[in-house]
Amino acid sequence: MPQRLQILYNTVIVPKLQKELGYTNIHQVPRLEKIVINRGLGEASQNAKALESSIAEISAITGQRPVITRAKKAIASFKIRKGMPVGLMVTLRRERMYAFLDRLINVALPRIRDFRGVSPKAFDGRGNYTLGIREQLIFPEINYDSVDQLRGMDISIVTTAKTDEEGRALLKAFGMPFAS
């Protein structure tokens, strides 16, 4: 079943951006490709409970089980051996991607303390946007009492936009609250 933002994109955003950016074909209009959520876990190598609680939190937030990322090589100063778990990653596409973006923009970001908007400078030069979140409590799926430690995450929104301006126009049309 199509999500609210997916219907908004197809009915309102595509014609608006097509006119605004001067495209002749609707397939030239930038669209969301995927959303990648990444969490680095430095303490996971010593604490297996931290890894399990992080898996449960990210599964609750995204509705999808994360992949455990492992160390590619040993680093003695960090007490990490090759193959040890060092983080978690989830790639969201299609309906889950639109559902997550909807919750992020309309529910989670407004719950951040002293929130004045996200940085308009966090684009990578190719129209993709990356956002860092310091604590997982901004998501309503996380129960405050079950959190043992505040952990952040990186959210990368990958678009088919060719420039940062196109990517910014797309995310602004979705309702992303950029700081002025």
UniProtKB/Swiss-Prot annotation:
Keyword Metal-binding set for record: no
> What GO annotations for molecular function exist for this entry?
rRNA binding; structural constituent of ribosome; tRNA binding
What residue ranges carry the coiled-coil annotation? none
Question: SUPFAM superfamilies of this UniProt entry?
Answer: RL5-like
The protein's UniProt keywords, in alphabetical order, are: Ribonucleoprotein, Ribosomal protein, RNA-binding, rRNA-binding, tRNA-binding
Q: Which GO terms describe its cellular component?
A: ribonucleoprotein complex; ribosome
InterPro entries registered for this protein in UniProt: Ribosomal_uL5, Ribosomal_uL5_bac-type, Ribosomal_uL5_C, Ribosomal_uL5_CS, Ribosomal_uL5_dom_sf, Ribosomal_uL5_N
- Please indicate if the UniProt record lists Ribonucleoprotein as a keyword: yes
GO BP terms: namely: translation
Its function, per the record, reads: This is one of the proteins that bind and probably mediate the attachment of the 5S RNA into the large ribosomal subunit, where it forms part of the central protuberance. In the 70S ribosome it contacts protein S13 of the 30S subunit (bridge B1b), connecting the 2 subunits; this bridge is implicated in subunit movement. Contacts the P site tRNA; the 5S rRNA and some of its associated proteins might help stabilize positioning of ribosome-bound tRNAs.
Give the UniProt family note: Belongs to the universal ribosomal protein uL5 family.
Assembly description: Part of the 50S ribosomal subunit; part of the 5S rRNA/L5/L18/L25 subcomplex. Contacts the 5S rRNA and the P site tRNA. Forms a bridge to the 30S subunit in the 70S ribosome.
Q: What is this protein called?
A: Large ribosomal subunit protein uL5
* Gene that produces this protein: rplE
